Every structure is written in structure tokens, then in C-alpha cells.
Amino acid sequence: MEKVYIAGAIPEVGLNLLKEHFEVEMYEGEGIIDKATLMEGVKDASALISILSTNVDQEVIDSASNLKIIANYGAGFNNVDVKYAREKDIDVTNTPKASTASTAELTFGLVLAVARRIVEGDKLSRTQGFDGWAPLFFRGREVSGKTIGIIGLGEIGSAVAKRAKAFDMDILYTGPHQKKEKEREIGAKYVDLNTLLENADFITINAAYNPDLHHMIDTEQFKLMKSTAYLINAGRGPIVNEEALVKALEDKQIEGAALDVYEFEPEITEGLKSLDNVVITPHIGNATYEARDMMSKIVANDTIKKLNGETPQFIVNK
């Protein structure tokens, strides 16, 4: 019986599917699996279920002589050396679409949280209390009728746009390609990055990471933004130079920021935690029961297909 190694606990629905077909070994230690344990686990495995926080590099891949598939539990896959896996004739898969609704909801939740100062207000109410309603007390910004600029109009970005439409927002987007069908569907307008930054009240990053996008948002980009603008990153941390972000916030170049992903994740750049106009969450974009269960089904089904001689559905390194 072929062995499947899982680099961290996944929901039972996918785990049980795998156990019906294969010998399954799962890392159940605390925290992220260390490299030595990972290499020991995969050395005789036909499949690896990798977690987004697990680095699957050349050394790990070389330690697994029987490996046929790396099924990455996450929509992203920049934690896996996909090119080297292809050289070794190993399929790498991911879990797209399962994260769409959950991450779009979280993105828009961050928009509302930072604009209406919800987290800040919760903290105040719990610690100091307040004297009651007053005309100038604790004002934030309305979202309705404003302009949202979406960096990356993929599945998640499009879902964010649909939610923005319900708030009567004007929708700008940028990316490598204009998507005219999406424009008609959701009423979005394609612009270049600088135009988006200059005009958007809320800038959401929903793009997947690649090296070309590293520090796409840096010192010069913050200078283009409105002083009342908010930056929301629910895509990938390294797209933003967080040192430049902290300075932009401290210098009041922008109004605020909300982050679910970080440049040096899981570390959070010094300065972000101490700023009241920043909302930070621990990478929970798709952390819903529904999304995580669906993701476990996807990695299980693609693993089953591959080890049964079929083509997995979501290969990212064809």
C-alpha cells in the first residue's frame, strides 16, 4: 500500500478519504513541522500533503525518492519549489476556489474593521470605557459610495468586487491583463497601478505572489495614495514593503491599514502592532469550517487520482 505523508493536521473529511485508500502518516506535533522531521516522513512516501507554512525545497524533494505528487493545502504554492518538482516529474497541486468566499469575506471584513475603527473601539470599550455618545467622538470613514481599488482580479478579487458593489462602491482594478467579461459582470474599470493608487479610497491586495510582485507597494507607491486611503493586504505579505508601510502610517501619508498576511510571516514587522490605525489578523483568510473542509477534500481527491494513475484536477506545474 502506498504511503501518504501529511505535514500537519488537516480536517477529518479529507483525512478519512485518504485512509480509505492508502497508508497515512500525519505530523501531529506542535507548531510547524521542522525540516528534518519532514524529510524523514517523506523519504518513502508516494504523496506529500504540504501545508502552506511548510517549505518544500529541493532538499526535501530529493529526500523523497518515491514521490509522485505534492498536494499543497492552500490556494498559494510559493512554499513549494514547483519548477524543481516538475524536473523530478512530480505534480504539484493546490486548492483554488475553496478559499474564494472565505477570503473575500475576510478582505471586506478588514475594510469595514479599519474604516469604522471596530477593533480600536472594542479595545477602548474593554479597557477604558467611554462617556457615551458625542458628536465628535470616535469618527471613522464610511465605505458606501467610495472607490475600491483591487490589485488582482482573480477569483478572490472578483468576489471582493461583488461585495463592494453591494456597498455602491466604484470599482477599479489592476493586474497583468484586462478582463472585459469581468468588467461587464461586476462593473469594474481596468487602470494601471499608479492610477488605482491615486484614486482609490480602499486598496485591497488579492494577488498571488510571484517575484515580479515583490515590494510592488513601496515608498513611492505610498506617496501616490490619498492621505485618507486604507491599504488592505489579504494576498501575500511580500507584495508590500512593511518598513515603508510603517513609515507611511506614522507620517500620516495614509489613513490606515489592515493586514492578514505579512512580509516576514509569521513575524510581524516592528511598529505595526503599536499603531492604532492598523488591524492585524493571523492569516485567517480561509479559516472557516467550510473552506478548510473543502480544501482537505481537494488535496485528498487529487492525491487519490494521481496515485491511481489519473490526472489531478488542480496541477500548478504542468
Curated annotation (Swiss-Prot):
<dbReference type="GO" id="GO:0016616">
    <property type="term" value="F:oxidoreductase activity, acting on the CH-OH group of donors, NAD or NADP as acceptor"/>
</dbReference>
<feature type="active site" description="Proton donor">
    <location>
        <position position="283"/>
    </location>
</feature>
<feature type="binding site">
    <location>
        <begin position="234"/>
        <end position="236"/>
    </location>
    <ligand>
        <name>NAD(+)</name>
    </ligand>
</feature>
<protein>
    <recommendedName>
        <fullName>Putative 2-hydroxyacid dehydrogenase SH0752</fullName>
        <ecNumber>1.1.1.-</ecNumber>
    </recommendedName>
</protein>
<comment type="similarity">
    <text>Belongs to the D-isomer specific 2-hydroxyacid dehydrogenase family.</text>
</comment>
<dbReference type="InterPro" id="IPR029753">
    <property type="entry name" value="D-isomer_DH_CS"/>
</dbReference>
<dbReference type="InterPro" id="IPR050857">
    <property type="entry name" value="D-2-hydroxyacid_DH"/>
</dbReference>
<dbReference type="InterPro" id="IPR006140">
    <property type="entry name" value="D-isomer_DH_NAD-bd"/>
</dbReference>
<feature type="binding site">
    <location>
        <position position="260"/>
    </location>
    <ligand>
        <name>NAD(+)</name>
    </ligand>
</feature>
<feature type="binding site">
    <location>
        <begin position="283"/>
        <end position="286"/>
    </location>
    <ligand>
        <name>NAD(+)</name>
    </ligand>
</feature>
<dbReference type="Pfam" id="PF00389">
    <property type="entry name" value="2-Hacid_dh"/>
</dbReference>
<dbReference type="Pfam" id="PF02826">
    <property type="entry name" value="2-Hacid_dh_C"/>
</dbReference>
<dbReference type="GO" id="GO:0051287">
    <property type="term" value="F:NAD binding"/>
</dbReference>
<keyword id="KW-0520">NAD</keyword>
<feature type="active site">
    <location>
        <position position="236"/>
    </location>
</feature>
<feature type="active site">
    <location>
        <position position="265"/>
    </location>
</feature>
<dbReference type="InterPro" id="IPR036291">
    <property type="entry name" value="NAD(P)-bd_dom_sf"/>
</dbReference>
<dbReference type="InterPro" id="IPR006139">
    <property type="entry name" value="D-isomer_2_OHA_DH_cat_dom"/>
</dbReference>
<feature type="binding site">
    <location>
        <begin position="155"/>
        <end position="156"/>
    </location>
    <ligand>
        <name>NAD(+)</name>
    </ligand>
</feature>
<keyword id="KW-0560">Oxidoreductase</keyword>
